[in-house]
């Protein structure tokens, strides 16, 4: 087991990391004792970096963290990961009023937020930086470019109403998995990836499990690899099979309170993977999919997804997905609160 030292801020850098074996573990904070300092796990590489093939199963590729053992990464618990506006924020304003209390320890100066659009133009999504916090009032470092509604719409007869307030998500975490930037990054869109999977070698099965909470994925995913047998998403579970809630031997996987901050493919996918809990995550700027599910019994609860780009169709669509529990589906524009 490799446990990352939590005595100081840490930065680790590699082209490929592979965790392989029943007793092989990479630990950076646990659910009971989250990582307290700042940690950056930087994955390096570009389109010319040699792939790391597995003996069978999906290709690990490059700029990758492969999990065929156990991975535990837990950052500091940020509390509420997203909320809504309590009042309309006008274009040109540098303050927003939130509808719910947030933890000022994490919703703090320097932290990044994403504010969803409330018009028909998805590119009115705004990524902003906090300058100061006073209760539910947040002052930003720059003025807003667009109006974001904080309102409720009701039918004239009062028979129904809808909250149409813009969502506000917290993107910053103290633990980050980062795709290293490079000169051709904008053209190649080749970010970091985490693959949780299994393979067999000489009669032994190496199966991966991952517990990931309060982690920020920065410049993740690799554009162009979208097939179910090789999904180069920010985080993909492939042939993971069953997660067992609370299993003491570690056969449990979940993704909770994470932020996917600027992705070059889908943020997250589950393929031949069952019973994984994916809850309270904030997803900003994805390609093709926000989250893709091809498993059974996976639980997607209270996740916010903003700005999904469908490049092949040459159009953009903003996905705002709040709460859904379903399986055997591809998630495109699911709204169910």
Could you say what each language-model-derived stretch is?
Residues 31, 112, 118-120, 133-135, ...:
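An acidic- and aromatic-residue-enriched active-site/binding cleft used to recognize and process polar
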Residues 173-174, 209-219, 249-264, 274-288, ...:
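Right-handed parallel beta-helix
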Residues 91-134, 242-246, 250-254, 263-269:
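A conserved hydrophobic secondary-structure block that centers on an alpha-helix together
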Residues 178-262, 274:
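Conserved, compact domain cores that house catalytic/ligand-binding motifs in diverse enzymes
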Residues 7, 23-25, 38, 181-190, ...:
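Short glycine/acidic-rich loop motifs that flank beta-strands on beta-rich extracellular proteins
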Residues 3, 18, 27, 66, ...:
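Extracellular beta-strand solenoid repeats
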Residues 132-138, 222-223:
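Short, conserved beta-turn/loop elements at beta-strand boundaries and strand-helix junctions
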């Amino acid at each position: 087991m490799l446990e990352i030292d939590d005595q100081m801020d840490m930065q680790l850098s590699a082209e490929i990391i592979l965790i392989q074996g029943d007793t092989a573990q990479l630990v950076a904070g646990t659910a009971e004792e989250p990582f307290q300092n700042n940690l950056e796990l930087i994955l390096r590489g570009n389109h010319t970096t040699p792939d790391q093939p597995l003996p069978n199963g999906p290709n690990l590729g490059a700029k990758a963290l492969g999990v065929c053992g156990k991975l535990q990464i837990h950052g500091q618990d940020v509390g509420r990961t997203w909320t809504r506006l309590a009042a309309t924020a006008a274009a040109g304003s540098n303050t927003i009023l939130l509808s719910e209390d947030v933890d000022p320890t994490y919703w703090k100066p320097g932290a990044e937020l994403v504010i969803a659009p409330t018009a028909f133009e998805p590119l009115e999504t705004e990524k902003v930086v906090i300058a100061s916090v006073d209760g539910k009032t947040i002052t930003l470092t720059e003025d807003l470019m667009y109006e974001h509604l904080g309102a409720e719409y009701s039918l004239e007869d009062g028979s129904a109403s809808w909250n149409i307030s813009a969502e506000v998500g917290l993107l910053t975490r103290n633990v980050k998995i980062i795709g290293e930037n490079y000169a051709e990054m904008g053209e190649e869109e080749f970010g970091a990836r985490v693959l949780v999977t299994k393979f067999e070698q000489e009669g032994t099965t190496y199966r991966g499990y991952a517990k990931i909470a309060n982690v920020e994925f920065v410049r993740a995913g690799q554009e162009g690899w979208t097939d179910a047998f090789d999904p180069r998403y920010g985080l993909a579970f492939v042939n993971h099979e069953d997660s067992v809630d609370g299993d003491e031997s570690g056969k449990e996987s979940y993704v909770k309170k994470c932020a996917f901050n600027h992705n070059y493919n889908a943020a997250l996918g589950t393929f031949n993977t069952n019973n994984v809990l994916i809850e309270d995550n904030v997803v900003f700027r994805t390609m093709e999919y926000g989250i893709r599910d091809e498993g059974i019994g996976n639980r997607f609860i209270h996740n916010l997804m903003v700005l999904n780009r469908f490049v092949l169709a040459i159009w953009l669509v903003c996905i705002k997905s709040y709460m859904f529990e379903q399986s055997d589906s591809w998630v495109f524009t699911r709204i169910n609160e």
